Amino acid sequence: MSLLRYFIFFIGGCTLALASGVSYTEASVYMSGLSGNENEVPSISPSDSRLVFAHKLGVSRFHKLKSHSGARKIINEMLHSHSELSSFFYAEKSNTFLTIAGLAESELFDTLNPAFRISSCPSSNAFASLMCRYERQLDSLDNGKTTDIYLNDIGGVISIHDSTGVYSQITTTPYKSLEDYEQLFGEDKASMFDISVKQDRVFLSEIYALKILVEFLSSKSQQERSDTSIVIGQLVGLEALYEKYGKDSKIYQVARENMMTLLSMIKQVSSTYTFILLPPIDSSETSTRYHKRQVDMEAFGEEIEEVVASYEKNYNGRCYISEEACSKATNDCSGHGRCSKYGQLDSCYVCQCSNSVVSNAAGQNKTIRWAGESCSKQDISVEFQFFFWFTIIGFGLLIFSIMLLFSIGQEELANVLTSTATVIKKTT
C-alpha cells in the first residue's frame, strides 16, 4: 500500500474534521444474512466492532476475542446464519465491505434492520485507518495483494484483495463522471452539480466508481467457480457534500438518494456484503483536531502482535516450543480452546479445541466443533460423513431397486396367467 494513500487519508480526514469536529452518534452496520430485531438491535463498542469485522474478513487471528466481549454473541449469530456445510458444497463468492460516510441508518433498506450499531461512532478517518490495518493483515495471510482500483484526494478509496487476479484502476475525468451521472439519474439532477467545485467532483467520481463496481460484481456473481476476492471501500463524497452545502440542501438530498440506489444495486449482485453507515457529522462539536487525532488512534483499540505463526516451532514443525509461543501465534487458539502440552513430549504445545454452543431464533441450541492448528475452522467431519454415507447408501438402494424391478420384468408369467383357453361352463 503506497505512502500516497496514507497521506491522502490524513489530509482528507483533516479537511472534514476541521469543518465539523468529532461526532459521537451511532453508526449502523448492515450484513448479509444477519438482521437485528426491530426493537432490539444490539449496540457494541468500536473495539468490539473491530473484532466482528475481523471475523467477517477472515483476519480474526490478529485480534484477541475476550470471553465476555460484546462481539462474541454477534459472531456466534454469524456462524449460525452462514452454514459452513453449505459453503463446502457451493462455490464461495466475493465479499464486499464498504464504509459510507454521511448516510444515516433510517435512509437505507426499509425492510432490513441493522445487524448492530456502533456506539460513540469514530470518524471516517478512523475507519479508513482500520481498513488499512485489515488490508495489511489480509496480505500477510495469503501472500496476496490488495490493489487500489479507485482513489480520490479526500480519502475515498475502493480496493480489491485477491491472491490471483490482476485489476486495472478506475480512471475518469470530471466531464466523463458528470456525463455518466446524467445517463444514470437524468439531466435535471446532473444540472445541480458543478464540476468546478471539489466536493462535487469527488462525489461524481465515487458514483462512477460504484457503477463500475456493480458491473464487476455482477460479472463475478455469474461465474460458477469459487471467488475469494474481497472488495474494501471507503466512500466520503456524500459527507463532503454534507459539509459543503448542509443536510437540508437539495444537492445533498439528491446525492443521498443516488448513493442509496447504488448500494441497493450492490446488495443485489453481491452474495456477501457489509455496509457501515456513518451518520453525518454534528457540526456543533468543538473538539480540537489534536484531540480528534488522539481519539482516531485509540478508537478501535489494539490488535495483537501482527504475526502469523512466526513464533518458533520444534524440530518437526508441528508443535510450539512453549505455551506462550502457542498462545501468541494462534491468538489463544482463536478463542475456541487453549494451548496445552502434547502427550509426554518436551517443548511441544498445541491447541486443544473446545466446542461452542449457540442458540438459533427458535431458542434451540447448536453445538459448533472447532478444528485446525489454531481452532479457527469449523469441524464438519460428522456432517460430511453423515451426508456422504447417506448419499452412498441411498444411491445403492436406488440401483438395487432398479435391478430388482428389471429382473422381475424378465421372468415368464405363470401358466394360469398366460393361458388363453376359454373356460366353458357345463350344464346338466
UniProtKB/Swiss-Prot annotation:
InterPro entries linked: Archenteron_Induction-Rel, Vps3844_C, Vps3844_N
Entry GO CC: endoplasmic reticulum; endoplasmic reticulum membrane
Keywords: Endoplasmic reticulum, Membrane, Signal, Transmembrane, Transmembrane helix
GO terms classed as biological process: vesicle-mediated transport
Membrane topology, from the record: Single-pass membrane protein
Top-level taxon of the source organism: Eukaryota
Cytoplasmic side: 407-428
Transmembrane region(s): 386-406
Compartmental location: Endoplasmic reticulum membrane
Region forming the signal peptide: 1-19
Stretches of the chain found on the membrane's Lumenal side: 20-385
Protein name per its UniProtKB record: Uncharacterized endoplasmic reticulum membrane protein C1709.03
Entry annotated with the keyword Signal: yes
